[in-house]
Curated annotation (Swiss-Prot):
Name of protein: Penicillin-binding protein activator LpoB
Entry membrane topology: Lipid-anchor
HAMAP family xref list: LpoB
Keywords on record: Cell outer membrane, Cell shape, Lipoprotein, Membrane, Palmitate, Peptidoglycan synthesis, Signal
Signal peptide: 1-19
Keyword Membrane annotated: yes
Provenance organism: Citrobacter koseri (strain ATCC BAA-895 / CDC 4225-83 / SGSC4696)
GO biological process assignments: peptidoglycan biosynthetic process; regulation of cell shape
Matching InterPro entries: LpoB
Subunit (UniProt): Interacts with PBP1b.
Sites of S-diacylglycerol cysteine lipidation: C20
Family (UniProt): Belongs to the LpoB family.
Lipid addition sites, N-palmitoyl cysteine: C20
Pfam families to which the protein is assigned, alphabetical: LpoB
């Protein structure tokens, strides 16, 4: 009898438990909601850098030859010797010329209307008087030193007769030969004057034409 009651109790307990299981509400299931879509940020417009136009290369300044350039001066050559030799011969035979004295030959002074090589003329004159038999010439070195004392270069003419006489006295000369080329530079005339240093007197003068070579 007791064993049957035990079975009945077990059966009743099983029924009770099954009822409880049937009445249990299911656990709430959280509904997975999709995440709200974020609105897409508007894209910032990419700034467009305007292209810099290519600047055409400017041509350099056009160089023109200087039209105002002066032409090189013409180099003239003269036959000084043909003009000087006859004049020197006459001077050595002039009255008042005493042999054995010292002669200062000044540089030929250019008084023409153009440019000429006065140094060449002076050298030719000194050569024409070399070994003349009457005068001893003041050396070119002595004359250059005397000119430097006046602030002149050896090639410079003394310019005036008074300066020439003053230099002649300083170097111990008794005579001075003053020469100049004058007139048209294309056909100059050569003038010579032989002066006595002591008095400044012109004891001989001559003039001759000079031809170009």
């Amino acid at each position: 009898m007791m064993k049957m009651n035990r079975y009945a109790l077990v059966a009743a307990l099983a029924i009770f438990l099954s009822g409880c299981v049937g009445q249990r509400e299911p656990a709430p299931v959280d509904e997975v909601k999709p995440a709200p879509e974020q609105p897409a940020e508007p894209q910032q417009p990419v700034p467009v850098v305007p292209s810099v136009p290519t600047i055409p290369q400017q041509p350099g300044p056009i160089e023109h030859e200087d039209q105002t350039a002066q032409p090189a001066p013409r180099v003239r050559h003269y036959d000084w010797n043909s003009a000087m030799q006859p004049m020197v011969g006459k001077m050595l035979q002039a009255d008042g010329v005493t042999a054995g004295n010292v002669l200062l030959v000044d540089s030929v002074n250019n008084r023409t209307n153009g440019s000429l090589n006065a140094g060449e003329a002076t050298e030719t004159l000194r050569n024409a008087l070399a070994n003349n038999g009457k005068f001893t010439l003041v050396s070119a070195q002595q004359l250059a030193m005397a000119k430097q004392q006046l602030g002149l270069s050896p090639q410079d003419s003394l310019g005036t007769r008074s300066k020439a006489i003053g230099i002649a006295r300083n170097v111990g000369a008794q005579y001075v030969l003053y020469s100049s080329a004058a007139g048209n530079v294309n056909a100059p005339s050569l003038q010579m004057q032989l002066m006595l240093v002591q008095t400044g007197e012109i004891i001989w003068s001559g003039k001759g034409a000079v031809q170009q070579q």
